[in-house]
Amino acid sequence: MTIDRYAVIGNPISHSRSPAIHAEFARQTGQQLSYEALLAPLDGFRDAVERFRRAGGRGMNVTVPFKLEAFALTDRCAPRASAAGAVNTLAFGPDGIFGDNTDGAGLIRDIVHNLDRPLERQRVLLLGAGGAARGVLLPLLAARPASLTLANRSVDKAHALAAAFRSHAPDVALDACSFVDLAGRVFDVVINATAASLANEAPQLPPGLYAANALAYDMMYGCGDTPFLAAARSDGATQRADGLGMLVEQAAESFLLWRGVRPDTAAVLAALRRQLDGG
């Protein structure tokens, strides 16, 4: 029996939880496949993808720092990937390489489905204006919040990002500002798409951002609160979540694209959480 091959590619890659996630998805759905982690040289992404494809690979997940290169490698892209200008999922077929970006869909599904927080008519704040923010912006707009504010330490980047996406959702109030300019404003959902948690820091935000029953969401994850979530707790955010659910849900979106079946994520997410917490 031929086993379909998949992989996640990045640099670094040894920390990736994707092989374990997809192995469980395959077991759960009865799919015959293998999934491995591939380390690509920083200057050798294209060659590594082509080698895997020529060897019979069916698809790949792409992580840092190669999502922009993956976008350039595709023959066709999903609209959400085109809008993001970045790809985290490749599917190889007879008509070439198809690219998708499942990050935003994973974020929305985690918030709306797992956390039971509808985004429609909510005041949403997205922190950051880099690749992580850009990758989730179109699905966030499609969720039809009342307003979506992009805040960044460099306000010019936030304004440029808002201008690039404003036409995608003319009925959503989309604005941009600096962190300092957030003073006096209140939000129902605050999403951290900055890399501050990687440096064990939190974005420097003015106090009083969180409405009653607000959600603070960090796209990073770890054991216990990230620095952003700890700061949000102190500032009154009553619901807090890290990005582990987003990781699992974006993987499920990739699996659905490749295999045509959506796996159940609840058990996988619970198992990963136990591992993170040392259980």
UniProtKB/Swiss-Prot annotation:
Pathway: Metabolic intermediate biosynthesis; chorismate biosynthesis; chorismate from D-erythrose 4-phosphate and phosphoenolpyruvate: step 4/7. GO terms for biological process: amino acid biosynthetic process; aromatic amino acid family biosynthetic process; chorismate biosynthetic process; shikimate metabolic process. Coiled coil: none annotated. NADP(+) binds at G128, A129, G130, G131, A132, M219, G243. GO terms for molecular function: NADP binding; shikimate 3-dehydrogenase (NADP+) activity. Disulfide bonds: none annotated. Its EC number is 1.1.1.25. It comes from the Bacteria. Shikimate binds at S16, R17, S18, T63, N88, D103, Y221. It catalyses: shikimate + NADP(+) = 3-dehydroshikimate + NADPH + H(+). It is an enzyme of class 1 (oxidoreductase). GO terms for cellular component: cytosol. CDD domains: NAD_bind_Shikimate_DH. Involved in the biosynthesis of the chorismate, which leads to the biosynthesis of aromatic amino acids. Catalyzes the reversible NADPH linked reduction of 3-dehydroshikimate (DHSA) to yield shikimate (SA). Homodimer. Belongs to the shikimate dehydrogenase family. This is Shikimate dehydrogenase (NADP(+)). It comes from Aromatoleum aromaticum (strain DSM 19018 / LMG 30748 / EbN1) (Azoarcus sp. (strain EbN1)).
